[in-house]
């Protein structure tokens, strides 16, 4: 029996060989007496010729073959005539003369053509995901995903890490996003939660003495979705004992250097740049800045603190900021109507408006110019390095609104003006995060990362007296404006964990109820430990040049957390609900 060969791997060295091929019919062309088929398998395409001079029977069978039929071909590899060479195909210099063909399975006419360029809606593609996955671009994406995970595994295995599995059915905790809950049949009225991350288990693994753990972990979060979020996702989960934050960052960036070289053949320089959180916010208005282009925020609060333009001076008086973007040389590119569109854009981020000025040779012109003194104009010109033709866009508001709106506007303009080199990969560590965030509505602090993150040692004494100023021993890895993931050195002493829970507003009873197992473990010689978790789906999205996370997940959910292919979520039977001691409220759906 002949060994099957892969269609896309045939080349001129195979000319004259008899081959066995199996795959799908990409395209069929009947030229009257001759039939041509593009045969597709996971390796690519090859043209197969059915010619009565080689086999009448094969030609007769081919007359009944249609797109996406699964077929088996026996034939001979031959060189194409010079005039029929197809430079757009990897196998375009050869073809296979069929001596026999067998139809292994027929196919209905697909709801869309199986090719990379398709204008079919994403909903249709997701409903027929098994057909969508046949497209070459998705095949390439999932090969890249496999290569990436293999590269990561090989690196960590060589560094003496153990790949270990943590529970999927676990305990619901109050911090973070909403949990997906799983009702217990054995314990009526009680619920498991699907893990948002293996955070506590990997810390317990360190307390178990393994020292180096990793997992390609499935995680679940019941949160509002967007282009770079999914309810179930995969993260590269890593935890170590006895390493400092610098050592963990060094190890992680060497791992990413290996991935970039092996998967993309790109060399990245180490060490990766680092930037404190506050600097990232001040310069880019973002804690995950895209550093592939400049266009940084320019702060002018001190210059306009006493301005006659009350929007500016009142923002400063109220403890806010005034900052601007200088769009170099683009004043003539933006009409009032265009600027109005930009104003509507920043309002999405709670900005009240967008003030603007245009620079000519001698002055700044615009609706707010008459309210600014000569000293203020001179100060703005100097601070923003204003030149003829520049467009200045200001936001004056609460500090977080200024950062959010100008940070988002910066990215919008970067894309609109073609300032971003899409071929570049810019990594960045963001460090010195705030340990806590204050929620004015609830009147309490929340952990900026999670409640198990340790403070930088020199800030520990301020945890109860000035919690807002305490910095976390935490670090996020950013690539091209996307957070790949983050990590921290964990709290390993019970007294500090108790103190952290107290600052977060937990009573002793609440802390014991939710995290008693962790507090107990901390009393039995927990080692200093820390780690990191990187989003695998997001890494693949960026390496594959995808704009949508769904294209990196085999069977993703829609923006409404639905699976259009299987129709999940779905109702269940009354018997199933009764077994789980669950009764639906009136008006809720079931089967």
UniProtKB/Swiss-Prot annotation:
Residues that bind ATP: 221-223, 230, 483, 535-538
Q: Give one GO molecular function term.
A: catalytic activity, acting on a protein
Keyword entries, A-Z:
Aminoacyl-tRNA synthetase, ATP-binding, Cytoplasm, Ligase, Nucleotide-binding, Protein biosynthesis
Instruction: Report which reactions are catalysed by this protein.
Output: tRNA(Asp) + L-aspartate + ATP = L-aspartyl-tRNA(Asp) + AMP + diphosphate
Residues that hold L-aspartate according to the record: 175, 221, 449, 490
A single BP term in Gene Ontology: aspartyl-tRNA aminoacylation
PANTHER family named among the record's database cross-references: ASPARTATE--TRNA LIGASE, MITOCHONDRIAL, ASPARTYL/LYSYL-TRNA SYNTHETASE
Task: Report the protein's function.
Answer: Catalyzes the attachment of L-aspartate to tRNA(Asp) in a two-step reaction: L-aspartate is first activated by ATP to form Asp-AMP and then transferred to the acceptor end of tRNA(Asp).
HAMAP family to which the protein is assigned, alphabetical = Asp_tRNA_synth_type1
What's this protein's family per the entry? Belongs to the class-II aminoacyl-tRNA synthetase family. Type 1 subfamily.
- Please state what the protein is called: Aspartate--tRNA ligase
Species for this entry: Oceanobacillus iheyensis (strain DSM 14371 / CIP 107618 / JCM 11309 / KCTC 3954 / HTE831)
């Amino acid at each position: 029996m002949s060994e099957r060969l892969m269609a896309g791997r045939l080349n001129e060295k195979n000319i004259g060989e008899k081959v066995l091929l199996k795959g799908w019919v990409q395209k069929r062309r009947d030229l009257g007496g001759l039939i041509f088929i593009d045969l597709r398998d996971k390796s690519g395409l090859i043209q197969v010729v059915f010619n009565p001079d080689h086999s009448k029977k094969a030609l007769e069978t081919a007359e009944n073959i249609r797109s996406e039929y699964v077929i088996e071909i026996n034939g001979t590899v031959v060189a194409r005539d010079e005039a029929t060479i197809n430079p757009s195909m990897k196998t375009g210099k050869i073809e296979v003369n069929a001596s026999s063909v067998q139809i292994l399975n027929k196919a209905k006419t697909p709801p869309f053509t199986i090719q990379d360029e398709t204008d079919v809606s994403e909903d249709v593609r997701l409903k027929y995901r098994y057909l969508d996955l046949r497209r070459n671009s998705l095949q390439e994406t999932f090969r890249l995903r496999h290569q990436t995970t293999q590269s990561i595994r090989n690196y960590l295995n060589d560094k003496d890490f153990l790949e270990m599995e943590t529970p999927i059915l676990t305990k619901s905790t109050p911090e973070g996003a909403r949990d997906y809950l799983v009702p217990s049949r054995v314990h009526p009225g009680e619920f498991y939660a699907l893990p948002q991350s293996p955070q506590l288990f990997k810390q317990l693994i360190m307390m178990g003495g393994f020292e180096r753990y990793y997992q390609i972990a499935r995680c679940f979060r019941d949160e509002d979705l967007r282009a770079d979020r999914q309810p179930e996702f995969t993260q590269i989960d890593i935890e170590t004992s006895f390493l400092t934050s610098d050592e963990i960052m060094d190890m992680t960036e060497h791992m990413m250097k290996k991935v970039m070289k092996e998967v993309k053949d790109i060399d990245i320089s180490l060490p990766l740049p680092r930037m404190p959180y506050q600097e990232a916010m001040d310069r880019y208005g973002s804690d995950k800045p895209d550093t592939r282009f400049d266009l940084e925020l320019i702060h002018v609060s001190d210059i306009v603190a006493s301005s006659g333009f009350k929007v500016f001076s009142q923002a400063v008086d109220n403890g806010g900021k005034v900052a601007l973007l200088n769009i170099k040389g683009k004043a003539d590119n933006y009409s009032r109507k265009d600027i109005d569109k930009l104003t509507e854009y920043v309002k999405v981020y709670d900005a009240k408006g967008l003030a603007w000025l245009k620079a000519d040779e001698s002055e700044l012109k615009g609706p707010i110019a008459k309210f600014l003194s000569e000293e203020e104009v001179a100060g703005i010109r100097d601070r923003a390095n204003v030149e003829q033709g520049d467009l200045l866009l200001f936001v004056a508001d609460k500090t977080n609104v200024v950062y959010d709106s100008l940070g988002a506007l910066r990215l919008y303009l970067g894309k609109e003006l073609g300032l971003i080199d899409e071929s570049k990969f810019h990594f960045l560590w963001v460090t010195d995060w705030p340990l806590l965030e204050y929620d004015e509505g609830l009147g309490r602090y929340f952990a900026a990362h999670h409640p198990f993150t340790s403070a930088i040692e020199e800030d520990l004494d301020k945890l109860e007296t000035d919690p807002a100023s305490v910095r976390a021993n935490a670090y996020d890895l950013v690539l091209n404006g996307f957070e790949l993931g983050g990590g921290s050195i964990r709290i390993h002493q019970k007294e500090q964990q108790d103190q952290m829970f107290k600052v977060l507003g937990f009573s002793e009873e609440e802390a014991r109820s939710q995290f008693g197992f962790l507090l107990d473990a901390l009393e039995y010689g927990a080692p200093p430990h820390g780690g990191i978790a990187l989003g695998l789906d997001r890494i693949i999205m960026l390496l594959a040049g995808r704009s949508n996370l769904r294209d990196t997940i085999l069977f993703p959910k829609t923006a409404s957390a639905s699976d259009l292919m299987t129709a999940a979520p779905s109702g269940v039977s009354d018997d199933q609900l009764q077994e789980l001691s669950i009764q639906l409220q009136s008006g809720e759906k079931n089967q």
